[in-house]
Amino acid sequence: MKKTLLAIIAVFALSACRQAEEAPPPLPQQISDRSVGHYCSMNLTEHNGPKAQIFLNGKPDQPVWFSTIKQMFGYTKLPEEPKGIRVIYVTDMGNVTDWTNPNADTEWIDAKKAFYVIDSGFIGGMGAEDALPFGNKEQAEKFAKDKGGKVVGFDDMPDAYIFK
């Protein structure tokens, strides 16, 4: 009897875990007065340049906000930060009409599918060079050709660039 009960509990537990994994990720949130950068504790509306938001497992309504793309990458690599990341969104700079205020018409894209222009000299929201995310590879390549820099994917982002 105990073995049967344990088997039934195990089946339900595994089923619940599988359902949680198969649920769609949370949708990106728009930047508001309550969007505060994880590292700088400043309101994101006060900064220009691309932004990022990370949703952790079990917290679908509470994104972790980032004032820069480099900060977001740092968060994913630093050992002291949470690793239960559900989804990451970044600003699609290919669809921004006002680069001095990308918050006004932000389109969010999956960070792992984005193309990043690095080493372009672009100064982000915290006054330092930052990566520029694009949802379209051709737009990223055109930007890099016109303004300088190179295009990399999420998994190819060099640690030396993130932490310099």
Predicted regions and their residues:
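Short, non-ligating residues that shape and space the ligands of small metal-coordination modules
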Residues: E46-G49
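Bacterial signal peptide processing site
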Residues: R18-A20
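Mid-length scaffold segments of soluble, non-membrane domains
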Residues: Q62-P102, E107
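Positively charged n-region of N-terminal signal peptides that target proteins for export
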Residues: M1-T4
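Beta-strand-rich cores of mature extracytoplasmic or soluble domains
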Residues: T100-G149, F154
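Short cysteine-rich clusters marking metal-coordination/redox-active sites
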Residues: G37
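Cys/His-coordinated zinc-binding microdomains
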Residues: S41
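C-terminal motif of bacterial Sec signal peptides marking the signal peptidase cleavage site
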Residues: A13-A16
